[in-house]
Amino acid sequence: MFNSCISLKVGNKDVKTNNSTSNLNTIEFINSQENIDRGYPFSEATVVNGIIFLSGEIGTLPDGTLIDGGIEAETRQTLTNIKNKLEKMGGSMDDIFKCTCMLSDIKDWPLMSLEYKKFFNPQKLPARSAFAGSGLALGAKLEIECMAIKKN
């Protein structure tokens, strides 16, 4: 049969897990206390078989408000938030292999792309999709979700 494990993390603390020692067929749910306190209906990330799936991230400041300054500022803050989350999980931007960028206006694509490239090694750019859609959280101009390899 399957050797599976489900664990829940709040901050850095394991809340629930079973005795499985295999990383295959496992799901790890990762949330910060801030995410829980704000009542968001999703995990910040899940880890499945060594792959990190980050939920869509927008350019929020630590207090939860959206940064001012347009698409460039939002792109920088969004990617800074992604970088910080990966670092808390023991990873880095070099571990990202796929990004999906959702823009409220596709005309912002060139400026978003200029800022986006600053966060990655030019020799290791992740695969990427980008599209326009309306109704991003908090009226954001950009939302990015990523997949990364968990190295530890």
State each model region's role.
Residues 97-99:
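Surface-exposed aromatic
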Residues 2-80, 84-89, 94, 103-152:
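N-terminal presequence-like segments and the immediate start of the first folded domain
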